[in-house]
Amino acid sequence: MTDVAKTLEELCTERGMRMTEQRRVIARILEDSEDHPDVEELYRRSVKVDAKISISTVYRTVKLFEDAGIIARHDFRDGRSRYETVPEEHHDHLIDLKTGTVIEFRSPEIEALQERIAREHGFRLVDHRLELYGVPLKKEDL
């Protein structure tokens, strides 16, 4: 999905987590994901690597990683919590409401506008999340 300076396994170890082989498998799958998988999809991918991994192990591991701040949970209005590694560089999301496709993008103009708005209201921005939802334009709308 994104370049990760340190592997999830390294981040977990730094935070004092015991890395079982099953956690390593789940961490590698998250790192290698080009999409934003939900727990059920992580489970499907995990059992292809290690058939002994249970769905409850995936749920517990995802919760552990999320609580440690090394993965981010997203709710893209499709009724599922979806996950990605916490990227080094901030990005926002554009979600296709018809297909569920998630497009990651960066916009210096949007980032600057958000900073300006926070300052105008007397705040220093420390974090934010922008998710845009839409449907593809029809050819006649272009």
UniProtKB/Swiss-Prot annotation:
Q: Where is this region: DNA-binding?
A: 1-87
What are the start and end residues of every segment in region (Dimerization)?
A: 88-142
Task: Please name the CDD domains in this protein's record.
Answer: Fur_like
Q: Which UniProt keywords apply?
A: Cytoplasm, DNA-binding, Iron, Metal-binding, Repressor, Transcription, Transcription regulation, Zinc
Q: Which residues bind Zn(2+)?
A: 36, 84, 93, 104
The molecular function terms in GO held by this entry are: DNA-binding transcription factor activity; transcription cis-regulatory region binding; zinc ion binding
Q: Main location per UniProt?
A: cytoplasm
Residues binding Fe cation, per UniProt? 90, 92, 111, 128
Q: Which family does it belong to?
A: Belongs to the Fur family.
The protein depicted here goes by the name Ferric uptake regulation protein
